[in-house]
């Protein structure tokens, strides 16, 4: 089959790539006659037949040209071999450098804690791996999570449905009672609404629904859900979920997430709080993501440059940002997801306590709010500077970072308001409440307990990254103190435990001190028998806490209670193998322990 240098008429007409054959492939496909306008002159038919794949006429080379070409080819081949050898040498050097870097990183990781921040799932997996490593020596169970373990095993995936939504406007007096409760006990600690402005919109709702914005309606039903959920009567749980389903349905309408608005952020924050009550932590994560996008679009993380913005609105912007910052940062810590708001260049002032009375009658809530901001900022700094997997700190550099954060923690301790310091001393003493507390003081004391536990977790995160013996001691003593507070106040005292924040998992993950004490039990071979029994008792306290939290966090808390119970049984099994004299004490302890 002959090849032609020019394209055939069909290929030219249809602008196709012609293969120059007769008949060409395109003409065969279209069933057309293949014709070339300019035929190649076949003057040297023998040459064409000898090399018919090439249409250029063949001209024999002279002997001298042939020798020169051969010499050039040999030189090019030698140069290519030399270049290849050089590339192999460079490749070997790079491989050696990579292996050297890997070895140095492995040596560093023996001194420095692992790069990833201890999220809840990673903590549970670490505890399971520790059990496996300890029981392997006794040829016992070697795979604690035989079927694997992930966040899907912890967090429910159900979502609200429109079928259960509350489709009417509730009674005005009843709704006002719910709003008063919200501003009295929730908005004081998480200030995102000016009470006066919100109640003005509430009055408009019962005059004409068209006078209020759709985002306000979302927050209204979400607040009703929060208020009703705190009522411990069983028949009200469905009503609370019905109000929340209404909010959920309203944000599904087209366009809600397309345009950022301050009112939408406020509504989503309330929904995040109630989603925590339903253990819908995956929903919390998704809502936090949408909140972050709106916060960045509205530049709430920066002080406004708008001269026309009054001080009241500027203060509202600050408080909304810091509430979102706490929610998003603590959520990312628990899930182990990258932070969003924490990595922004934050130029936002702390809340002004002079505005506290505008958000709630109880101004003490501002003390709680400001302390939680400071602790969240510290947790984020610990995460980014000590647990960043991309950085392997040298000992000197790591100690410098730890020392710097220690200074900031000391400054935080000195800045704690006197009202809270008094309660902190009570928590450390562990002797129970010295006086009767009214409802307002009970809420404030519960919030102080949660701030103290958040403070303890901050210390644990810091000293987990410290390889020194002193750091390990501080980490263990802090974990024991945190568990003692949980046992003495949140498990035993019902008036205090009933006020626990729905966001307890994000603010202070109780599994963090649990894992610290649990690891010490299994890793310390010289542990005193009396101390060992006390530590096991502490582990049972965390188990009891999760059982108690079933009323607040439902299915999620129940799953955590099962996980901690399995870990405690494994610890008792291992310790019994190590020291049979202690085993009888464990049996008596597990039988007598009750919540």
From Swiss-Prot:
CDD domains: fungal_TF_MHR, GAL4. GO terms for cellular component: nuclear chromosome; nuclear membrane; nucleus. SMART domains: Fungal_trans (SM00906), GAL4 (SM00066). InterPro entries: AtrR-like (IPR050987), Transcription_factor_dom_fun (IPR007219), Zn2-C6_fun-type_DNA-bd_sf (IPR036864), Zn2Cys6_DnaBD (IPR001138). Residues 8-34 bind DNA. GO terms for molecular function: DNA-binding transcription factor activity, RNA polymerase II-specific; RNA polymerase II cis-regulatory region sequence-specific DNA binding; sequence-specific DNA binding; zinc ion binding. This is Uncharacterized transcriptional regulatory protein C1773.16c. It comes from Schizosaccharomyces pombe (strain 972 / ATCC 24843) (Fission yeast).
